[in-house]
Amino acid sequence: MDIVYAIFTCIVSLLFICVTPVLVLVLRIYVGKTIRNPNYAPVVGTLFHQLFYYNRLYDYQAEVAKKTPTFRLLSPEQSEHYTTDSRNIEHILKTNFGKYSKGKRNQEIIMDLFGEGIFAMDGEKWKQQRKLASFEFSARVLRDFSCTVFRKRAAKLVSKELLMRCSLDSIFKVGFGVDLNCMDGSSGDDNEFIKAFDDANALTYWRYVDPLWKLKRFFNIRSEFFLKKNIKFIREFVDELIRTRRKQLEMKQDSMDKEDILSRFLLESKKDPEKMTDQYLRDIILNFMLAGKDSTANTLSWFFYVLCKNPLIQVKIVEEVREVIGNNMKDNGRVDDFVATITEQVLEKMHYLHATLTETLRLYPAVPVDGRCADADDVLPDGFHIRKGDGVYYMSYAMGRMPYIWGNDAEDFRPERWLKDGIFQPESPFKFIAFHAGPRICLGKDFAYRQMKILSMALLHFFRFKLSDDMKVVTYRTMFTLHINEGLQVCAVPRRGLVEA
Protein backbone atom coordinates (compact mmCIF):
# COMPACT_ATOMS: atom_id res chain seq x y z
CA MET A 1 0.00 0.00 0.00
CA ASP A 2 2.86 2.32 0.88
CA ILE A 3 4.44 1.62 -2.50
CA VAL A 4 1.21 2.48 -4.33
CA TYR A 5 0.89 5.69 -2.31
CA ALA A 6 4.49 6.62 -3.09
CA ILE A 7 3.95 6.03 -6.80
CA PHE A 8 0.74 8.08 -6.68
CA THR A 9 2.55 10.91 -4.86
CA CYS A 10 5.32 10.92 -7.46
CA ILE A 11 2.81 11.04 -10.32
CA VAL A 12 0.88 13.91 -8.71
CA SER A 13 4.11 15.80 -8.05
CA LEU A 14 5.25 15.37 -11.64
CA LEU A 15 1.87 16.50 -12.95
CA PHE A 16 2.03 19.55 -10.68
CA ILE A 17 5.53 20.38 -11.88
CA CYS A 18 4.45 20.05 -15.52
CA VAL A 19 1.03 21.69 -15.31
CA THR A 20 1.90 24.67 -13.09
CA PRO A 21 4.22 26.36 -15.63
CA VAL A 22 1.57 25.88 -18.32
CA LEU A 23 -1.11 27.43 -16.12
CA VAL A 24 1.19 30.35 -15.29
CA LEU A 25 1.92 30.75 -18.99
CA VAL A 26 -1.78 30.77 -19.89
CA LEU A 27 -2.48 33.28 -17.10
CA ARG A 28 0.27 35.55 -18.38
CA ILE A 29 -1.14 35.28 -21.88
CA TYR A 30 -4.64 36.39 -20.94
CA VAL A 31 -3.93 39.04 -18.28
CA GLY A 32 -3.90 42.65 -19.47
CA LYS A 33 -4.25 41.94 -23.19
CA THR A 34 -7.43 44.04 -23.78
CA ILE A 35 -9.21 40.96 -25.11
CA ARG A 36 -12.70 42.43 -25.45
CA ASN A 37 -11.74 46.04 -26.19
CA PRO A 38 -13.16 46.93 -29.66
CA ASN A 39 -10.31 49.37 -30.22
CA TYR A 40 -7.98 46.40 -30.59
CA ALA A 41 -7.98 43.72 -33.28
CA PRO A 42 -10.09 40.66 -32.44
CA VAL A 43 -8.34 37.82 -30.63
CA VAL A 44 -8.54 34.51 -32.51
CA GLY A 45 -6.17 32.45 -30.40
CA THR A 46 -2.85 32.19 -28.61
CA LEU A 47 0.65 30.98 -29.17
CA PHE A 48 -0.69 27.44 -28.76
CA HIS A 49 -2.90 27.78 -31.85
CA GLN A 50 0.21 28.31 -33.98
CA LEU A 51 1.77 25.27 -32.36
CA PHE A 52 -1.31 23.17 -33.13
CA TYR A 53 -1.42 24.26 -36.79
CA TYR A 54 2.35 24.46 -37.21
CA ASN A 55 2.74 22.10 -40.19
CA ARG A 56 0.18 24.12 -42.16
CA LEU A 57 0.68 27.42 -40.37
CA TYR A 58 0.46 29.75 -43.37
CA ASP A 59 -2.75 28.15 -44.63
CA TYR A 60 -4.25 28.45 -41.15
CA GLN A 61 -3.38 32.16 -41.16
CA ALA A 62 -4.95 32.57 -44.61
CA GLU A 63 -8.17 30.90 -43.45
CA VAL A 64 -8.42 33.27 -40.49
CA ALA A 65 -7.53 36.33 -42.60
CA LYS A 66 -10.38 35.65 -45.05
CA LYS A 67 -12.78 36.26 -42.15
CA THR A 68 -10.71 38.80 -40.22
CA PRO A 69 -8.10 40.74 -42.25
CA THR A 70 -6.44 41.96 -39.05
CA PHE A 71 -6.40 39.73 -35.96
CA ARG A 72 -4.44 39.00 -32.81
CA LEU A 73 -2.76 36.00 -31.27
CA LEU A 74 -1.80 36.33 -27.62
CA SER A 75 1.59 35.41 -26.19
CA PRO A 76 3.04 35.82 -22.68
CA GLU A 77 4.93 39.04 -23.40
CA GLN A 78 2.63 40.90 -25.80
CA SER A 79 -0.08 40.67 -28.43
CA GLU A 80 0.94 39.56 -31.91
CA HIS A 81 -1.07 41.37 -34.61
CA TYR A 82 -1.40 39.79 -38.05
CA THR A 83 -2.72 41.66 -41.07
CA THR A 84 -3.35 41.36 -44.80
CA ASP A 85 -4.57 44.96 -45.11
CA SER A 86 -2.25 46.77 -47.54
CA ARG A 87 -2.98 50.09 -45.77
CA ASN A 88 -1.61 48.70 -42.52
CA ILE A 89 1.42 47.29 -44.30
CA GLU A 90 2.24 50.63 -45.91
CA HIS A 91 1.80 52.25 -42.51
CA ILE A 92 4.33 50.07 -40.67
CA LEU A 93 6.82 49.70 -43.54
CA LYS A 94 6.78 53.26 -44.87
CA THR A 95 4.49 55.94 -43.41
CA ASN A 96 5.35 55.25 -39.76
CA PHE A 97 8.60 53.39 -40.43
CA GLY A 98 10.41 55.15 -37.57
CA LYS A 99 7.98 53.83 -34.95
CA TYR A 100 8.68 50.18 -35.73
CA SER A 101 11.77 48.00 -35.40
CA LYS A 102 12.76 44.33 -35.42
CA GLY A 103 11.96 44.25 -31.73
CA LYS A 104 13.71 42.64 -28.78
CA ARG A 105 11.82 39.33 -29.04
CA ASN A 106 12.53 38.87 -32.74
CA GLN A 107 16.20 39.71 -32.32
CA GLU A 108 16.49 37.35 -29.36
CA ILE A 109 15.05 34.49 -31.41
CA ILE A 110 17.11 34.99 -34.58
CA MET A 111 20.37 36.30 -33.12
CA ASP A 112 22.09 32.91 -32.82
CA LEU A 113 21.71 32.26 -36.55
CA PHE A 114 21.69 35.72 -38.15
CA GLY A 115 23.79 37.60 -35.61
CA GLU A 116 24.15 41.27 -36.51
CA GLY A 117 23.28 40.81 -40.17
CA ILE A 118 20.92 43.05 -42.12
CA PHE A 119 17.77 41.00 -41.37
CA ALA A 120 18.30 41.18 -37.62
CA MET A 121 19.45 44.78 -37.29
CA ASP A 122 17.97 48.27 -37.15
CA GLY A 123 19.64 51.64 -36.86
CA GLU A 124 23.22 52.35 -37.89
CA LYS A 125 24.32 48.76 -38.54
CA TRP A 126 21.34 48.18 -40.82
CA LYS A 127 22.03 51.46 -42.65
CA GLN A 128 25.73 50.63 -43.03
CA GLN A 129 25.12 47.18 -44.51
CA ARG A 130 22.35 48.38 -46.80
CA LYS A 131 24.41 51.32 -48.05
CA LEU A 132 27.44 49.18 -48.89
CA ALA A 133 25.34 46.45 -50.51
CA SER A 134 23.32 48.98 -52.51
CA PHE A 135 26.50 50.09 -54.31
CA GLU A 136 26.91 46.57 -55.65
CA PHE A 137 23.29 45.90 -56.56
CA SER A 138 23.03 49.22 -58.41
CA ALA A 139 26.30 48.84 -60.28
CA ARG A 140 26.13 48.14 -64.01
CA VAL A 141 29.11 45.80 -63.71
CA LEU A 142 27.17 43.56 -61.31
CA ARG A 143 24.30 43.35 -63.78
CA ASP A 144 26.63 42.35 -66.61
CA PHE A 145 28.73 40.02 -64.45
CA SER A 146 25.70 38.32 -62.90
CA CYS A 147 24.24 37.66 -66.35
CA THR A 148 27.51 35.96 -67.33
CA VAL A 149 27.56 33.83 -64.17
CA PHE A 150 23.89 32.87 -64.46
CA ARG A 151 24.38 31.81 -68.08
CA LYS A 152 27.34 29.59 -67.16
CA ARG A 153 25.42 27.99 -64.30
CA ALA A 154 22.34 27.55 -66.49
CA ALA A 155 24.37 25.60 -69.04
CA LYS A 156 25.40 23.16 -66.30
CA LEU A 157 21.93 23.04 -64.81
CA VAL A 158 20.29 21.82 -68.01
CA SER A 159 22.63 18.86 -67.99
CA LYS A 160 22.53 18.04 -64.28
CA GLU A 161 19.19 19.31 -62.96
CA LEU A 162 20.73 20.82 -59.85
CA LEU A 163 18.45 23.73 -59.08
CA MET A 164 19.42 24.49 -55.50
CA ARG A 165 23.12 24.02 -56.15
CA CYS A 166 22.97 26.24 -59.21
CA SER A 167 21.39 29.00 -57.17
CA LEU A 168 23.97 28.64 -54.40
CA ASP A 169 26.87 28.57 -56.88
CA SER A 170 25.62 31.78 -58.49
CA ILE A 171 25.13 33.58 -55.18
CA PHE A 172 28.63 32.66 -54.00
CA LYS A 173 30.28 33.79 -57.24
CA VAL A 174 28.33 37.01 -57.78
CA GLY A 175 27.89 37.95 -54.14
CA PHE A 176 31.12 36.72 -52.60
CA GLY A 177 33.55 36.32 -55.51
CA VAL A 178 34.24 32.65 -54.76
CA ASP A 179 33.68 29.60 -56.97
CA LEU A 180 31.87 27.16 -54.72
CA ASN A 181 31.54 24.57 -57.51
CA CYS A 182 28.97 22.59 -55.57
CA MET A 183 27.26 21.80 -58.89
CA ASP A 184 30.17 19.53 -59.71
CA GLY A 185 29.39 17.43 -56.65
CA SER A 186 33.06 17.51 -55.73
CA SER A 187 32.61 18.45 -52.09
CA GLY A 188 30.49 16.76 -49.47
CA ASP A 189 30.81 19.88 -47.32
CA ASP A 190 28.75 21.83 -49.86
CA ASN A 191 25.84 19.40 -49.57
CA GLU A 192 26.18 19.39 -45.80
CA PHE A 193 26.17 23.18 -45.79
CA ILE A 194 22.88 23.34 -47.71
CA LYS A 195 21.27 20.87 -45.29
CA ALA A 196 22.69 22.59 -42.21
CA PHE A 197 21.53 25.98 -43.43
CA ASP A 198 17.99 24.80 -44.15
CA ASP A 199 17.73 22.90 -40.86
CA ALA A 200 19.03 25.89 -38.88
CA ASN A 201 16.47 28.06 -40.65
CA ALA A 202 13.62 25.73 -39.63
CA LEU A 203 14.87 25.17 -36.07
CA THR A 204 15.27 28.90 -35.45
CA TYR A 205 11.73 29.53 -36.71
CA TRP A 206 10.45 26.82 -34.34
CA ARG A 207 11.42 29.10 -31.45
CA TYR A 208 8.46 31.35 -32.24
CA VAL A 209 6.02 28.66 -31.11
CA ASP A 210 8.16 26.85 -28.54
CA PRO A 211 7.69 28.44 -25.09
CA LEU A 212 10.51 26.28 -23.70
CA TRP A 213 13.21 27.08 -26.26
CA LYS A 214 15.35 29.11 -23.84
CA LEU A 215 15.30 26.25 -21.34
CA LYS A 216 16.28 23.81 -24.08
CA ARG A 217 19.10 26.10 -25.16
CA PHE A 218 20.36 26.34 -21.58
CA PHE A 219 20.49 22.56 -21.23
CA ASN A 220 21.50 22.08 -24.89
CA ILE A 221 18.80 19.49 -25.57
CA ARG A 222 16.38 18.48 -28.35
CA SER A 223 15.80 21.16 -31.02
CA GLU A 224 18.35 23.53 -29.50
CA PHE A 225 21.04 20.84 -29.53
CA PHE A 226 20.59 20.33 -33.28
CA LEU A 227 20.37 24.07 -33.92
CA LYS A 228 23.64 24.70 -32.10
CA LYS A 229 25.31 21.88 -34.04
CA ASN A 230 24.13 23.26 -37.40
CA ILE A 231 25.11 26.83 -36.56
CA LYS A 232 28.62 25.67 -35.59
CA PHE A 233 29.06 24.00 -38.99
CA ILE A 234 27.65 27.03 -40.84
CA ARG A 235 29.97 29.44 -39.04
CA GLU A 236 33.03 27.33 -39.78
CA PHE A 237 32.02 27.08 -43.44
CA VAL A 238 31.56 30.85 -43.80
CA ASP A 239 34.74 31.62 -41.85
CA GLU A 240 36.64 29.56 -44.41
CA LEU A 241 34.91 31.48 -47.20
CA ILE A 242 36.09 34.79 -45.71
CA ARG A 243 39.66 33.51 -45.39
CA THR A 244 39.61 32.27 -48.99
CA ARG A 245 38.33 35.55 -50.39
CA ARG A 246 40.77 37.60 -48.30
CA LYS A 247 43.69 35.56 -49.68
CA GLN A 248 42.41 36.05 -53.23
CA LEU A 249 42.26 39.80 -52.77
CA GLU A 250 45.72 39.92 -51.22
CA MET A 251 47.19 37.91 -54.10
CA LYS A 252 45.15 39.92 -56.64
CA GLN A 253 44.40 36.79 -58.63
CA ASP A 254 40.77 37.71 -59.24
CA SER A 255 40.10 40.22 -62.00
CA MET A 256 36.73 40.96 -60.40
CA ASP A 257 38.42 41.67 -57.07
CA LYS A 258 36.18 44.58 -56.14
CA GLU A 259 32.97 43.68 -57.90
CA ASP A 260 31.26 41.52 -55.30
CA ILE A 261 29.56 42.31 -52.01
CA LEU A 262 32.01 40.43 -49.80
CA SER A 263 34.99 42.26 -51.31
CA ARG A 264 33.44 45.62 -50.57
CA PHE A 265 32.86 44.63 -46.93
CA LEU A 266 36.40 43.23 -46.67
CA LEU A 267 37.80 46.53 -47.91
CA GLU A 268 35.66 48.34 -45.34
CA SER A 269 37.00 46.06 -42.61
CA LYS A 270 40.53 47.29 -43.35
CA LYS A 271 39.38 50.85 -42.64
CA ASP A 272 37.80 49.96 -39.30
CA PRO A 273 38.89 46.45 -38.20
CA GLU A 274 37.57 46.91 -34.64
CA LYS A 275 33.98 47.38 -35.81
CA MET A 276 34.08 45.25 -38.97
CA THR A 277 35.31 42.03 -37.36
CA ASP A 278 35.31 38.61 -39.02
CA GLN A 279 32.33 37.65 -36.86
CA TYR A 280 30.43 40.69 -38.14
CA LEU A 281 31.41 39.81 -41.72
CA ARG A 282 30.14 36.28 -41.16
CA ASP A 283 26.79 37.59 -39.96
CA ILE A 284 26.51 39.84 -43.02
CA ILE A 285 27.28 37.00 -45.42
CA LEU A 286 24.80 34.60 -43.82
CA ASN A 287 22.02 37.15 -44.18
CA PHE A 288 22.75 37.82 -47.85
CA MET A 289 23.07 34.10 -48.42
CA LEU A 290 19.58 33.50 -47.03
CA ALA A 291 18.18 36.27 -49.22
CA GLY A 292 19.90 35.04 -52.36
CA LYS A 293 19.74 31.26 -52.12
CA ASP A 294 16.24 30.86 -50.77
CA SER A 295 14.49 33.58 -52.71
CA THR A 296 15.60 32.21 -56.08
CA ALA A 297 15.88 28.46 -55.49
CA ASN A 298 12.63 28.18 -53.54
CA THR A 299 10.72 30.38 -55.97
CA LEU A 300 11.98 28.39 -58.95
CA SER A 301 10.94 25.16 -57.24
CA TRP A 302 7.40 26.47 -56.79
CA PHE A 303 7.54 27.88 -60.34
CA PHE A 304 8.23 24.46 -61.84
CA TYR A 305 5.62 22.91 -59.57
CA VAL A 306 2.87 25.19 -60.91
CA LEU A 307 4.13 24.69 -64.48
CA CYS A 308 3.77 20.94 -64.02
CA LYS A 309 0.21 21.52 -62.82
CA ASN A 310 -0.45 23.91 -65.72
CA PRO A 311 1.28 22.47 -68.84
CA LEU A 312 -0.31 25.07 -71.13
CA ILE A 313 1.65 27.79 -69.33
CA GLN A 314 4.85 25.85 -70.06
CA VAL A 315 3.94 25.93 -73.74
CA LYS A 316 3.29 29.68 -73.66
CA ILE A 317 6.67 30.40 -72.07
CA VAL A 318 8.50 28.23 -74.61
CA GLU A 319 6.68 30.05 -77.41
CA GLU A 320 7.73 33.39 -75.95
CA VAL A 321 11.36 32.23 -75.70
CA ARG A 322 11.34 31.22 -79.37
CA GLU A 323 9.64 34.44 -80.41
CA VAL A 324 12.08 36.69 -78.52
CA ILE A 325 15.30 34.80 -79.28
CA GLY A 326 14.30 33.69 -82.75
CA ASN A 327 13.47 30.39 -84.37
CA ASN A 328 17.04 29.99 -85.61
CA MET A 329 17.98 28.65 -82.15
CA LYS A 330 16.86 25.01 -82.37
CA ASP A 331 15.87 22.75 -79.49
CA ASN A 332 18.66 20.33 -80.35
CA GLY A 333 21.43 22.94 -80.34
CA ARG A 334 24.25 23.32 -77.86
CA VAL A 335 23.28 24.48 -74.39
CA ASP A 336 26.07 27.03 -74.12
CA ASP A 337 25.14 28.46 -77.54
CA PHE A 338 21.57 28.96 -76.36
CA VAL A 339 22.34 30.60 -73.01
CA ALA A 340 24.81 32.92 -74.76
CA THR A 341 21.83 34.48 -76.56
CA ILE A 342 20.09 35.42 -73.29
CA THR A 343 21.15 39.05 -73.03
CA GLU A 344 19.75 41.81 -70.84
CA GLN A 345 17.73 43.04 -73.82
CA VAL A 346 16.24 39.57 -74.31
CA LEU A 347 15.28 39.34 -70.63
CA GLU A 348 13.46 42.67 -70.79
CA LYS A 349 11.22 41.34 -73.58
CA MET A 350 10.14 38.23 -71.66
CA HIS A 351 6.90 39.72 -70.33
CA TYR A 352 4.92 36.48 -70.03
CA LEU A 353 7.78 34.74 -68.21
CA HIS A 354 8.11 37.73 -65.88
CA ALA A 355 4.37 37.59 -65.21
CA THR A 356 4.52 33.85 -64.49
CA LEU A 357 7.39 34.26 -62.02
CA THR A 358 5.54 37.13 -60.35
CA GLU A 359 2.35 35.09 -60.14
CA THR A 360 4.43 32.34 -58.49
CA LEU A 361 5.70 34.84 -55.94
CA ARG A 362 2.17 36.10 -55.32
CA LEU A 363 0.96 32.65 -54.26
CA TYR A 364 4.28 31.28 -52.99
CA PRO A 365 6.28 34.25 -51.64
CA ALA A 366 9.86 33.57 -50.60
CA VAL A 367 9.10 34.92 -47.11
CA PRO A 368 5.55 33.87 -46.13
CA VAL A 369 5.32 36.03 -42.98
CA ASP A 370 7.36 39.02 -41.86
CA GLY A 371 6.83 41.88 -39.50
CA ARG A 372 7.94 44.60 -37.14
CA CYS A 373 7.58 45.53 -33.48
CA ALA A 374 5.94 48.73 -32.24
CA ASP A 375 8.36 51.02 -30.39
CA ALA A 376 5.47 53.26 -29.32
CA ASP A 377 1.69 53.12 -29.07
CA ASP A 378 0.10 53.53 -32.50
CA VAL A 379 -3.16 53.29 -34.44
CA LEU A 380 -3.29 51.39 -37.74
CA PRO A 381 -5.19 52.79 -40.75
CA ASP A 382 -7.94 50.19 -40.22
CA GLY A 383 -8.56 51.76 -36.79
CA PHE A 384 -7.07 49.08 -34.56
CA HIS A 385 -4.76 50.18 -31.75
CA ILE A 386 -1.23 48.86 -31.25
CA ARG A 387 0.49 48.94 -27.88
CA LYS A 388 4.19 49.54 -27.42
CA GLY A 389 5.99 46.20 -27.62
CA ASP A 390 3.32 44.49 -29.72
CA GLY A 391 4.36 42.69 -32.89
CA VAL A 392 2.72 43.55 -36.22
CA TYR A 393 3.13 40.88 -38.90
CA TYR A 394 2.07 41.02 -42.53
CA MET A 395 1.18 37.67 -44.09
CA SER A 396 2.51 37.56 -47.66
CA TYR A 397 1.34 33.98 -48.21
CA ALA A 398 -2.17 34.77 -47.01
CA MET A 399 -2.34 38.04 -48.96
CA GLY A 400 -1.92 36.20 -52.26
CA ARG A 401 -5.07 34.22 -51.47
CA MET A 402 -7.34 37.09 -50.41
CA PRO A 403 -10.36 37.69 -52.71
CA TYR A 404 -10.69 41.26 -51.40
CA ILE A 405 -7.17 41.96 -52.73
CA TRP A 406 -6.95 39.93 -55.95
CA GLY A 407 -10.57 39.16 -56.82
CA ASN A 408 -12.62 35.99 -56.68
CA ASP A 409 -9.95 34.08 -58.64
CA ALA A 410 -7.26 34.95 -56.07
CA GLU A 411 -6.31 31.30 -55.53
CA ASP A 412 -6.08 30.56 -59.26
CA PHE A 413 -2.66 30.62 -60.90
CA ARG A 414 -3.20 33.13 -63.70
CA PRO A 415 -0.16 35.02 -65.09
CA GLU A 416 -2.46 37.06 -67.33
CA ARG A 417 -3.56 39.14 -64.33
CA TRP A 418 -0.17 40.88 -64.60
CA LEU A 419 -0.40 41.67 -68.33
CA LYS A 420 -2.08 44.42 -70.33
CA ASP A 421 -1.79 44.10 -74.11
CA GLY A 422 1.02 41.61 -73.52
CA ILE A 423 3.07 44.04 -71.38
CA PHE A 424 3.83 43.35 -67.72
CA GLN A 425 2.06 45.71 -65.30
CA PRO A 426 3.50 45.94 -61.77
CA GLU A 427 1.35 46.34 -58.66
CA SER A 428 1.90 48.38 -55.52
CA PRO A 429 4.65 46.79 -53.37
CA PHE A 430 2.25 47.01 -50.42
CA LYS A 431 -0.21 44.80 -52.28
CA PHE A 432 2.39 42.49 -53.84
CA ILE A 433 4.71 42.28 -50.85
CA ALA A 434 7.02 39.43 -51.95
CA PHE A 435 10.06 41.75 -52.01
CA HIS A 436 9.15 43.70 -48.87
CA ALA A 437 8.47 47.44 -49.28
CA GLY A 438 9.42 50.86 -48.00
CA PRO A 439 12.99 51.70 -46.86
CA ARG A 440 13.75 47.98 -46.32
CA ILE A 441 12.61 46.86 -49.79
CA CYS A 442 14.72 44.00 -51.16
CA LEU A 443 17.91 45.26 -52.82
CA GLY A 444 18.23 42.10 -54.89
CA LYS A 445 14.83 42.15 -56.59
CA ASP A 446 16.19 42.70 -60.12
CA PHE A 447 19.08 40.34 -59.34
CA ALA A 448 16.62 37.58 -58.40
CA TYR A 449 14.42 38.07 -61.46
CA ARG A 450 17.48 38.02 -63.71
CA GLN A 451 18.71 34.72 -62.31
CA MET A 452 15.28 33.08 -62.35
CA LYS A 453 14.59 34.15 -65.94
CA ILE A 454 17.89 32.86 -67.30
CA LEU A 455 17.64 29.50 -65.52
CA SER A 456 13.99 28.94 -66.41
CA MET A 457 14.51 29.92 -70.06
CA ALA A 458 17.37 27.44 -70.40
CA LEU A 459 15.44 24.64 -68.73
CA LEU A 460 12.16 25.15 -70.57
CA HIS A 461 13.83 25.56 -73.96
CA PHE A 462 15.34 22.07 -73.73
CA PHE A 463 12.94 20.20 -71.45
CA ARG A 464 9.28 19.61 -70.77
CA PHE A 465 8.58 19.09 -67.08
CA LYS A 466 6.05 16.93 -65.29
CA LEU A 467 5.68 15.75 -61.70
CA SER A 468 7.21 12.37 -60.90
CA ASP A 469 4.11 11.53 -58.86
CA ASP A 470 0.92 13.42 -59.68
CA MET A 471 -0.79 11.99 -56.61
CA LYS A 472 1.80 13.17 -54.09
CA VAL A 473 0.72 16.22 -52.09
CA VAL A 474 3.31 18.99 -52.36
CA THR A 475 3.48 21.22 -49.30
CA TYR A 476 5.92 23.50 -47.50
CA ARG A 477 8.24 23.13 -44.56
CA THR A 478 7.43 25.77 -41.94
CA MET A 479 10.44 28.06 -41.65
CA PHE A 480 11.47 31.65 -42.43
CA THR A 481 11.36 30.93 -46.16
CA LEU A 482 8.77 28.98 -48.17
CA HIS A 483 10.68 25.77 -48.72
CA ILE A 484 9.07 22.77 -50.46
CA ASN A 485 9.04 19.97 -47.92
CA GLU A 486 11.27 17.06 -49.02
CA GLY A 487 12.04 18.85 -52.29
CA LEU A 488 10.27 18.78 -55.65
CA GLN A 489 10.45 15.55 -57.63
CA VAL A 490 10.00 16.17 -61.36
CA CYS A 491 10.69 14.38 -64.63
CA ALA A 492 12.48 16.37 -67.32
CA VAL A 493 11.65 15.11 -70.81
CA PRO A 494 13.96 16.41 -73.59
CA ARG A 495 12.02 18.34 -76.22
CA ARG A 496 14.43 17.09 -78.89
CA GLY A 497 18.11 16.25 -79.02
CA LEU A 498 20.45 17.95 -76.59
CA VAL A 499 24.13 18.71 -77.06
CA GLU A 500 25.71 19.41 -73.68
CA ALA A 501 27.95 22.40 -73.10
What annotation goes with each model-predicted range?
Residues 2-18, 74-81, 141-149, 156-173, ...:
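Cytochrome P450
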Residues 167, 171, 175, 231-238, ...:
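Central I-helix of cytochrome P450 enzymes
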Residues 311-314, 392, 445-483:
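Cytochrome P450 heme-binding "Cys pocket" and the immediately downstream C-terminal segment
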Residues 138-140, 201-202, 229-300, 327-346, ...:
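Conserved cytochrome P450 catalytic core segment spanning the I/J/K helices
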Residues 135, 418-452, 477-478:
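Cytochrome P450 heme-thiolate "Cys pocket" and heme-binding signature region
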Residues 394-423:
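Conserved cytochrome P450 K-helix/beta-meander segment immediately N-terminal to the heme-binding cysteine loop
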Residues 2-124, 128, 147, 151-155, ...:
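N-terminal membrane-proximal hinge/A-helix region immediately C-terminal to the signal-anchor transmembrane segment
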Residues 47-68, 233-236, 240, 334-382:
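Conserved cytochrome P450 K-helix E-x-x-R motif and the immediately C-terminal K′/meander segment
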